[in-house]
């Protein structure tokens, strides 16, 4: 019986952890606003601090970053003596520069409360070297490709002698290859692989294996992943010793869900020309106004094209920031920092570079203008909202017709989406025409936007044709006129997919292309010079090589048609041979053959069912931080 007045400790209270956390860590956590541990933190931190390898799967916004940072810091500060100069005690590997930067930022906020480590955060003067200290402290170094050279990284390492490295795989491998960087068993304590499935998706498997080969086997390892696929399982077998698996799921009425309970996932059925009017209606009607929103497009070229068009039509209170994988590293970092630091309503216009790994705080709304090519990415896009218990809304725009099959397709994968009903989003053809006219006005004002639109539309069609759910997203079903108008194009581009299309490629826009000018005077002058030279050179005569290359160009759909025709012919020949074989058999032989066929079909169905269940469990459980 409990003693009167004695209060039972909340198992998710930070001071209830065993082993207990240092007082300064409790102060740091309190300052960050984390009153209680999330389930993944409560499950992971005690095990990881207590000499266990861990494999952690959890839904998005579950607080995984602190789940490994706290144990790593505690391990380094509980050593019997400081780590030797130029020896590494811990490494955290991240798949992207942005995520590595965020992890380092959270670590810096944490270490600001530990006086010896906070002192090490101050940059050294030119030529000054970090003095050895008898006091235990954490000295970190962030390694990012594209921002510094490997030589600069090594120079900084030798100058600061960090004991904790946070890095992307390629740059880490380059540093570990130096004879001046040491990771012996006597010094090295812990390795963390964050977003392990993403590391493998991005093709870092060879780099990871080389990194593991340079580290001592006697170490603690934490693997954090949205899902433990077969490839991730291989890393687990090679790199971890008897790990404890921690899987944190969200219970729903229909069983386990792959997303937080605070996230509403919805869809709207809109033809292409109504997508942007529906977006503006959604942004205007939501109450309270979403402070941070993310809009997903399928390609980098589409982001570059639509950014100036959306800036011209968005409600005035919304700022727009773009981010995609083809931006130079400094531009990506600048734009990302601008979006995160924004205090007024801001929209991030992006591709799947922001679908995983970017821990963007307080995202209210996610809108998917284009469904992702990989169905797995759908979950991770949605998961940017509704993090850490905060309410969030995700809306995907689907075209009426075959794309509606995407709804049951997602439900099979434990990702149910519902029709968005409140507030009611209604658009009209007239409203769509007015908006398209405003966007087209921007395009007509600068030929550079025309060029961007042509490239972006071609890249979008290619992305659409490569969709993994190819039976749902079919190029053959696209309405080219509606799409061209939705994109505010003034001409449909020359592309193989439109070769046999007999519609109006001018979209009804009367335009003298010879007088269609660039805003940039230098580009416009160059265009006119080139046009004059072409006029003086006489009629264009293609070379034999150009003619041959033109003949080789085929639409994706045509290639598939040829493959299908070959497959059909093979199938017909196979059936004919089978009929001839059966004609030569006795009745008894036919009966035995039919019995074997039934058994084989039953076995195939059993394997298929098991495969579907396994895929649903493995591919769609959890999100990344």
Curated annotation (Swiss-Prot):
Residues 278-436 form the Helicase C-terminal domain. Its main location: nucleus. It catalyses: ATP + H2O = ADP + phosphate + H(+). The keyword Glycoprotein does not apply. Disulfide bonds: none annotated. Residues 550-597 are annotated as: Disordered. GO terms for cellular component: 90S preribosome; nucleolus; nucleoplasm; preribosome, large subunit precursor. A motif (DEAD box) lies at residues 194-197. It is an enzyme of class 3 (hydrolase). GO terms for biological process: assembly of large subunit precursor of preribosome; maturation of LSU-rRNA. Residues 45-246 form the Helicase ATP-binding domain. Residues 553-570, 577-597 have a biased composition (Basic and acidic residues). A motif (Q motif) lies at residues 14-42. The Q motif is unique to and characteristic of the DEAD box family of RNA helicases and controls ATP binding and hydrolysis. Belongs to the DEAD box helicase family. DDX55/SPB4 subfamily. This is ATP-dependent rRNA helicase spb4.
């Amino acid at each position: 019986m409990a003693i009167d007045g004695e209060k039972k400790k909340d198992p998710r209270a930070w001071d209830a952890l065993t082993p207990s956390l240092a007082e300064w860590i409790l102060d740091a956590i309190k300052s960050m606003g984390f009153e209680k541990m999330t389930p993944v933190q409560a499950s992971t931190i005690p095990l990881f601090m207590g000499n266990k390898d861990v494999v952690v799967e959890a839904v998005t916004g579950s607080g995984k970053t602190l789940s490994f940072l706290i144990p790593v810091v505690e391990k380094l500060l509980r050593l019997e003596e400081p780590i030797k100069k130029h020896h590494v005690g811990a490494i955290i590997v991240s798949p992207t520069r942005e995520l590595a930067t965020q992890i380092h930022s959270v670590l810096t906020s944490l270490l600001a409360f530990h006086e010896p480590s906070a002192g090490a955060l101050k940059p050294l003067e030119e030529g000054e070297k970090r003095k050895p200290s008898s006091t235990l402290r954490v000295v970190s170094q962030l390694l990012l490709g594209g921002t510094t050279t490997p030589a600069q990284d090594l120079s900084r390492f030798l100058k600061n002698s960090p004991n904790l490295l946070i890095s992307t795989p390629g740059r880490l491998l380059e540093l570990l290859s130096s004879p001046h960087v040491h990771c012996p068993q006597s010094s090295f304590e812990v390795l963390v692989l964050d977003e392990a499935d993403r590391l493998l998706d991005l093709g870092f498997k060879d780099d990871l294996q080389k990194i593991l080969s340079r580290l001592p086997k006697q170490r603690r390892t934490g693997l954090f992943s949205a899902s433990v696929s077969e490839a991730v399982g291989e890393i687990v077998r090679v790199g971890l010793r008897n790990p404890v698996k921690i899987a944190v799921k969200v219970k729903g009425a229909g069983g386990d869900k792959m997303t937080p309970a605070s996230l509403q996932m919805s869809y709207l059925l809109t033809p292409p020309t109504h997508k942007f009017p529906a977006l503006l209606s959604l942004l205007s009607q939501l109450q309270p106004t979403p402070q941070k929103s993310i809009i997903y497009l399928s390609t980098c070229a589409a982001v570059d094209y639509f950014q100036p068009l959306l800036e011209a039509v968005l409600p005035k209170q919304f700022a727009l920031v773009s981010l995609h994988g083809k931006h130079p590293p400094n531009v990506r970092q600048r734009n990302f920092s601008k979006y995160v630091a924004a205090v007024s309503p801001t929209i991030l216009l992006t591709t799947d570079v922001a679908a995983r790994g970017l821990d963007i705080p307080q995202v209210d709304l996610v809108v998917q203008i284009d469904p992702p090519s990989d169905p797995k990415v759908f979950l991770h896009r949605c998961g940017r909202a509704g993090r850490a218990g905060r309410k969030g809304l995700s809306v995907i725009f689907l075209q009426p017709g075959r794309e509606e099959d995407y709804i049951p397709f997602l439900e099979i994968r434990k990702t149910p989406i519902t029709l968005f009903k409140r507030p009611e989003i209604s658009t009209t053809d007239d409203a769509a025409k007015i908006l398209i006219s405003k966007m087209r006005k921007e395009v007509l004002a600068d030929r550079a936007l025309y060029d961007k639109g042509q490239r972006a539309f071609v890249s979008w069609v290619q992305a659409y044709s490569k969709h993994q759910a190819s039976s749902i997203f079919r190029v053959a079903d696209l309405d080219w006129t509606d799409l061209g108008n939705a994109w505010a194009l003034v001409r449909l581009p020359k592309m193989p997919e439109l070769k046999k299309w007999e519609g109006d490629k001018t979209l009804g826009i009367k335009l003298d292309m010879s007088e269609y000018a660039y805003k940039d005077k230098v580009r416009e002058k160059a265009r006119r010079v080139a046009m004059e030279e072409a006029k003086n050179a006489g009629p264009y005569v293609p070379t034999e090589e150009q003619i041959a290359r033109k003949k080789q160009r085929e639409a994706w759909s045509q290639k598939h048609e040829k493959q299908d025709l070959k497959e059909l012919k093979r199938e017909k020949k196979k059936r004919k041979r089978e009929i001839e074989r059966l004609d030569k058999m006795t009745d008894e032989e036919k009966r035995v053959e039919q019995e074997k066929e039934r058994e084989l079909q039953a076995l195939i169905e059993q394997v298929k069912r098991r495969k579907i269940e396994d895929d649903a469990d493995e591919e769609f459980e959890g999100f990344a931080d």
